[in-house]
Curated annotation (Swiss-Prot):
Membrane topology listed for this record: Single-pass membrane protein
The protein, known as: Cytochrome P450 monooxygenase 176
Gene (UniProt): CYP176
Residues binding heme, per UniProt: 445
Sorted UniProt keywords: Glycoprotein, Heme, Iron, Membrane, Metal-binding, Monooxygenase, Oxidoreductase, Transmembrane, Transmembrane helix
One of the Pfam families matching this protein, by short name: p450
Length: 520
């Protein structure tokens, strides 16, 4: 027996020793904490081999049946806690907000794509608090929100007209509508067509960035050392795509901002979030470089976050009304009784239309726009229900699982607004989907009131003036669409067929009149 090992033997021995070392560390780390339950982990991979590439929220929801609503998993060396009930999410991210308000470090986005991270991706600190105050002043102030009503009403009129003229393109019209609303509010930019230069470019940019991977879960997020490797080395191919994404992202931030700065001081500029912030933070008409970067980023986030998710809820509404026409008829009867046939509903009618409010809640529940939310990060070790949650854990709110909680929502697959009728405030504390689809605690979406008003006005206006029905095939048979949603950060509705037409000649007249009406 030779005492001299060849190179292959040495590699095998070294590998075995390394695996033994990692396994020992893995076992000791697990023993140090009384972790929440979860699927069995293995050294090196953790649970990576058990997490699917697609529809992760559904897999995590299945795990709830076995492990409960707080699940611990480990992806390579990163600890994750999947939170799948409203109660647990509120206990952790709201009642213990001091510990749970941080964000994980989005390495790819923050170091390769964005000059500075947007507020939604920013870690907790003074700069985050400053930008949060900006949004609160523009999106959570009642008088400021009322100032956006003419924009909503003007664009609703254009949307109804487009739906009447070319109903088959309803998804494109809804997309244009939301983009137009947010561009006007963010920059004062008026959109006249779905081919608006900025909207088209922004759509391409967002698609490019989202194709890089999920929040804080790309290869370089797990292996930060890859940031130092040349682009040609294995595992570093993301750099080329990230460079292209950065160029596009910078341009997306610059195009509307440059246009607005050029127009400021002239009659061509419209009041907007950006003009307001420039006036607030400039000194003697001049902006510091840091302030300019923050204003551009904040306006970009307002557009990106406000247009895409709201569009999803609106297209989900069209799908739901196609599948459940009895819901539309019940809502139309309520609107006709309360509002009448001489005008379209306005936001002042909101409290008088309770069934419409139930429909909105059910839309949020039936297809939550961001199924896995945006992850939080636990700053320090914590203990919940007797379980240890290690500091640094990524806290993932499984919003989709919350919306499918059978203890809150019987028959979860069915679109049934009546489930929200007659519930008191205590019941709504956990059942109202607004309690979880907009985020939690200090990280709750500051644009939620604007988004909610936007969705309400869209639903009320379409139901009051339009009939949504099922399309027919060449043989005259009804085409019943399958409720199908794209896998991704945002749960977009898959394309489907339906019919949309004015309810009556009087409704058609109201649609024509609405294009010049800015009273919401």
């Amino acid at each position: 027996m030779s005492l001299v090992l060849n190179r292959t033997d040495l590699l095998v021995v070294a590998g075995a020793l390394f695996l033994t070392f990692l396994t020992t560390r893995f076992i000791r780390a697990a023993q140090r904490y009384h972790l929440p339950p979860g699927p069995t982990r293995i050294p090196l991979l953790g649970n990576l081999h058990q997490v699917p590439l697609h529809d992760q929220q559904k897999t995590f929801a299945e795990w709830v049946k076995k492990y409960g609503d707080i699940i611990y998993i480990q992806l390579l060396s990163k600890p994750f806690v999947i939170v799948s009930s409203v109660r647990a999410a509120q206990d952790l991210m709201e009642k213990r907000a001091v510990k749970y308000s941080d964000r994980p470090y989005f390495l790819l986005l923050c170091e390769f794509v964005m000059t500075r991270p947007l507020m939604i991706f920013m870690q907790h600190g003074d700069r985050w608090r400053r930008l949060r105050r900006w949004y609160q002043g523009s999106l959570e102030n009642k008088s400021v929100l009322e100032g956006y009503r003419p924009v909503l009403r003007r664009e609703i009129g254009r949307l109804l007209s487009s739906l009447a003229e070319a109903p088959q393109d309803f998804m494109s019209h809804i997309k244009r509508y939301n983009g137009a609303v947010m561009l006007d509010i963010a920059y004062g930019h008026r959109v006249t067509s779905a081919e608006d230069e900025f909207m088209v470019f922004a759509d391409k940019t967002i698609s490019t960035v989202t194709s890089l991977g999920s929040f804080a879960a790309t290869l370089v997020d797990f292996f930060p050392i890859l940031r130092y490797f040349p682009a040609w080395t294995p595992g570093s191919g993301f750099k080329k795509q990230a460079l292209m994404a950065k160029e596009m992202w910078d341009e997306m931030e610059d195009i509307p901002y440059r246009k607005l700065r050029h127009e400021m001081g002239s009659d061509a500029v419209n009041r907007s979030f950006t003009t307001f912030m420039i006036g607030e933070v400039s000194h003697d008409g001049k902006l510091g470089a840091d302030d300019e970067i923050d204003i551009k980023g904040s306006a970009t986030l307002m557009y990106v976050a406000g247009s895409d998710t709201t569009m999803t809820t609106m297209t989900t509404f069209v799908l739901a009304m196609t599948l459940y026409p009895e819901v539309a008829r019940k809502a139309q009867a309520e609107i006709d009784h309360v509002v009448g046939l001489s005008r379209l509903p306005g936001l002042d009618d909101k409290d008088s239309l309770p069934y419409l409010e139930c429909i909105i809640k059910e839309l949020y529940r039936w297809n939550p726009p961001v199924p896995l939310g945006v992850p939080h990060r636990l700053c320090v070790d914590d203990n919940y229900r007797g379980y240890d949650i290690p500091g640094g854990s990524m806290i993932v709110p499984n919003v989709w699982a919350m919306s499918r909680d059978p203890s809150l929502y019987p028959d979860t697959k069915t679109f049934r607004p009546e489930r929200f009728e007659g519930l008191d405030a205590q019941a709504m504390k956990f059942r109202d989907p607004r309690k979880y689809i907009f985020g939690f605690g200090r990280r709750i979406c500051p644009g939620r009131y604007l988004a909610d008003s936007n969705v309400w006005l869209f639903l009320a206006s379409v139901l009051a003036s339009m009939d949504i029905g099922r399309a027919h095939d060449a043989a005259g048979h009804e085409i019943i669409p399958t409720p199908s949603f794209k896998d991704g950060i945002i749960s977009h509705v898959e394309p489907f067929q339906c019919t949309i037409r004015p309810r009556s000649e009087r409704a058609a007249q109201l649609i024509r009149e609405s294009t010049g009406n800015t009273s919401a």
